[in-house]
């Protein structure tokens, strides 16, 4: 890394500010050849680290723009090298002209993710930190963003540090028993050792499970609208989306397959699913749609169970059949504006964890309350404190650690000497190192940094 790289680090297109970033041993000297103040061009000795300098970016005799310039001296910079930033007005033509001049002065174009690669290679970031930055940039929801922020500030590094500490303690106990076997010392029993190893394994499995749950939320929770025909599922779908997506008709069986759309609720991505109305039918196509409705209902993260409270016999008959399936759902009593006098929400007081919302899709009565209840349910599934976000590569290494610990336990059960099962602990420790980026090949680095933009 003896060369100097440069790139635009702000988004393409016009903007209030456009930033060119340059890193490497020649960054300061190249920069000074373009920085013009009232006393002439600045020399490197005129430029103090971490102090904003207002000056003119000038190419030869031609003034290009009034800019702010920042210099970060090695090693106290993002990349660990001398790093300079030019803050221009954000015109793409202007930035291109300035960047071309910087290239002519001796810098070369940065490759994808090269600034972060240099930060990693110079020890400014471990690999989990680099991956966290990539996730931070690409996050599609507030939930994903907050999980990425946790990792930027060292969540995965803390977990691996904790795990490493537990494993080293275990390994040290085993090695002490080997090295001082002739001494009159007391060591933990094999049963106690197995309990400790199981504890470390459980720690890993918990991290993996929390990550899998986080990915499920990131990939979208599914909110399924379920009920008999003409209870208002399609109308509610359109109301929640704020647009006409589902066809509405008085004819039963209009929706024959599920329809889905993505929305954001409190920063959490969810997918609304409008299903076919559930009823007895001889129509083969409609029956297939009803079967899909059942599958969607079973796999839903949040269930909206719709009933039409304007028709006494209809909703009472349906609830008699379906009351046992309401636990944990939101019962949406639709058409409350024309409800039958027999409607009584207290009929469901014995159903566990059931929320009842009375609404009218026609008048919009109760819709804000329903939305609030949906958001509350979604939020309970999206508390960032309850989750860990592992990248696919990191998850693989955690799963490998679990396999190493499983083999360690099996070897102990089989009566293998400590010298043998300690080797599995060494493999597990090696996997922890891989999580944080103690890697020997360029392949992993290339795969990670290929997802970054040029100026990062």
Swiss-Prot record:
CDD domains: trmE, TrmE_N. GO terms for biological process: tRNA methylation; tRNA wobble uridine modification. Its cofactor is K(+). It is found in: Cytoplasm. The keyword Cell division does not apply. Binds 1 potassium ion per subunit. This is tRNA modification GTPase MnmE. The keyword Metal-binding applies. Mg(2+) binds at residues 234, 255. GTP binds at residues 230-235, 249-255, 274-277. It comes from Leptospira borgpetersenii serovar Hardjo-bovis (strain JB197). One of its GO terms (molecular function) is metal ion binding.
